């Protein structure tokens, strides 16, 4: 589909950006584009650049079969240079030679109050009264059975970058650490928000626990598909970009995805915009009623083989941290297969 035939750049406003993509939100009147986001590649060095078509094929062939229930469908659309040039990218450089973009549903469509809990965890509280929806956005990063080091890879990297401790993603994987993980996850939420959730009888913590105790939840799936014999050693053994297999590229992609977990009061309209429900679960809570839990996974971007030197440089820096002792950072859970 040629997007310029049904819309103009003025119908799109800046929404967000990552390290490789920029998102625009549709504000026009065309029904087909309502509640949609336009995802466009940012400018990169040619050697590191992966085209939208390559990404689309990778996601459809490699990622979609793994996460069919929580996959956000994307449509490949044709872009024109003139259309790209007229978008307000807020100074971010777009890859103007790219002929394609991706059209995706806006998971955050609606009115929400955003609370940034940490670098990789955002909380969105719906503004509708009474409260109908709560969304967590989490980047779980590396998920694996840590049986050797004091700190997992994610917590080690957060220490390297001087981020304060929030929660360890490994705690979300095991029956005996889920409650600890959730306590840490919820700890930065402002008291007034917790009071609102309690007052509105919206048991989001209990719902999150129910989600995590399902044996097929997205975190356990990510752990399964990220599995290697030795996550760090495998990277350090690479000699050139040619040594980066498609399987390793997939694993590195899955170590950098984001997850939206949406909790909403259940009624006949819940999830009506997405009949597949994409990983939905209806959960009944005594005294609270029924809730719908929806999980969406995003940022399934194929990692360039040229990044292997960057991955190795990070591992070298993390070496002294893995088994260090930080009084401000409790050790991570150790768990054998």
Where are the language model's segments positioned?
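Polybasic, positively charged surfaces/segments
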Residues: 2-337
